[in-house]
């Protein structure tokens, strides 16, 4: 099982809540994924609506909510969003996202580190979205983050793990959970993330914008279950030369 802070997760699949055509499809997809943690944007939530079916349904389930600070352009805005989320959702878990430019939504490492320090000191369980940069990941560990969430590729691109070399360094060196976030575009991308040693993946666009989000969510669930079983079974090493599986003898000994 995966442990983040004081919480255990059976599923290695975390899912987002954006881009769905309706709340109904979103909820069906979340339940089909069997994810135990979902992330949601503070900016999109109507906390004053007592008829918020989405939040009511999730609060009745055992799924953990991970509010995010998406849209924050600096540390000050991110800290404010985190405090609003804590008050509104009664959780000290926060996915820290700071991306000041809007075309590629790349994380601001400097502001992320500043905000992480403040939030950890204020009692938050901080999971920062960050570059696949081993140096910044080490710094985020040092300030007390509970996991790191390096991007596979830019948000919403579905390009997969375009920086897997650096991801492998992070996986080798970092001793807290590593969740590959952003760019996971297919179940095979998610499988690769687990096979190289990541602890979990966060998927949104690939599920929400597919032709059938419910079936796609289920396919990610099955793929990650298979990936975890394979990893725990001990994947066979790779080789650039052939290794015969049968004895090399004279054919039929004629």
From Swiss-Prot:
Keyword Magnesium: no
EC number: 2.8.1.10
Protein name, entry field: Thiazole synthase
Recorded metabolic or biological pathway in which this protein acts: Cofactor biosynthesis; thiamine diphosphate biosynthesis
Keywords, in A-Z order: Cytoplasm, Schiff base, Thiamine biosynthesis, Transferase
InterPro entries xrefs: Aldolase_TIM, Thiazole_synthase_ThiG, ThiG
Assembly and binders: Homotetramer. Forms heterodimers with either ThiH or ThiS.
Active-site feature positions: 95 (schiff-base intermediate with dxp)
Gene Ontology CC entries for this record: cytoplasm
Organism: Wigglesworthia glossinidia brevipalpis
Family: Belongs to the ThiG family.
Catalytic activity, as annotated: [ThiS sulfur-carrier protein]-C-terminal-Gly-aminoethanethioate + 2-iminoacetate + 1-deoxy-D-xylulose 5-phosphate = [ThiS sulfur-carrier protein]-C-terminal Gly-Gly + 2-[(2R,5Z)-2-carboxy-4-methylthiazol-5(2H)-ylidene]ethyl phosphate + 2 H2O + H(+)
A GO term, aspect molecular function: thiazole synthase activity
GO biological process, one term: thiamine diphosphate biosynthetic process
Domain of life assignment: Bacteria
Intracellular or extracellular location(s): Cytoplasm
Matching PANTHER family: THIAZOLE SYNTHASE
Function: Catalyzes the rearrangement of 1-deoxy-D-xylulose 5-phosphate (DXP) to produce the thiazole phosphate moiety of thiamine. Sulfur is provided by the thiocarboxylate moiety of the carrier protein ThiS. In vitro, sulfur can be provided by H(2)S.
Pfam families linked: ThiG
Residues reported in the UniProt entry to bind 1-deoxy-D-xylulose 5-phosphate: 156, 182-183, 204-205
């Amino acid at each position: 099982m995966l442990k983040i802070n004081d919480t255990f997760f059976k599923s290695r699949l975390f899912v987002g809540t954006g881009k769905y055509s309706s709340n109904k499809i979103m909820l069906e997809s979340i339940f089909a994924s069997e994810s135990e943690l979902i992330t949601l944007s503070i900016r999109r939530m109507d906390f004053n609506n007592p008829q918020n079916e989405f939040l009511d349904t999730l609060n009745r389930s055992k799924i953990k909510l991970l509010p995010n600070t998406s849209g924050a352009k600096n540390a000050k805005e991110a800290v404010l969003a985190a405090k609003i989320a804590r008050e509104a959702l009664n959780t000290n878990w926060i996915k820290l996202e700071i991306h000041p430019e809007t075309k590629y939504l790349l994380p601001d490492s400097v502001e992320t580190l500043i905000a992480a320090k403040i939030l950890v000191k204020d009692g938050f369980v901080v999971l920062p979205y960050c570059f696949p940069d081993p140096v910044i990941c080490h710094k985020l560990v040092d300030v007390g983050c509970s996991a790191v969430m390096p991007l596979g590729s830019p948000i919403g691109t579905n390009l997969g793990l375009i920086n897997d070399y650096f991801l492998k360094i992070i996986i080798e060196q970092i001793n807290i959970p590593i969740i590959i976030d952003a760019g996971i575009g297919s179940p095979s991308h998610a499988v690769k993330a687990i096979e190289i040693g990541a602890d979990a993946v966060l998927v949104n666009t690939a599920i929400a914008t597919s032709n059938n989000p419910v079936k796609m969510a289920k396919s990610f669930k099955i793929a990650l279950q298979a990936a975890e079983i394979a990893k725990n079974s001990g994947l066979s090493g790779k080789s650039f030369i052939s290794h015969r599986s049968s004895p090399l003898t004279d054919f039929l000994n004629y």
